[in-house]
């Protein structure tokens, strides 16, 4: 059994990546299981977990951080707003290059499974 999406790694909604993580999970799972025999399934499922765990953990942690930042109050909220107002959008978005630049090909290289 392989769990994907929120069943495997439920995330808070503050990064808006829940559906994306499910689609990435499905794509990686399909790739690692492609063409494998029954005797290879346990090893391929372990590879799926090795591939996905670091990224999904990072997404969940980033979502938690965003949630905290979105719910600041008082002086912290004012400071956050001042920093965000002064930050050009292209510079702000650089912090998410790791998120939006993900490529399945790069992820599969870590598994060392021919796809």
Task: Enumerate the language-model features and the residues they cover.
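C-terminal auxiliary extensions adjacent to catalytic cores
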Residues: 84-115
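Small/flexible residues
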Residues: 54-57, 82, 114
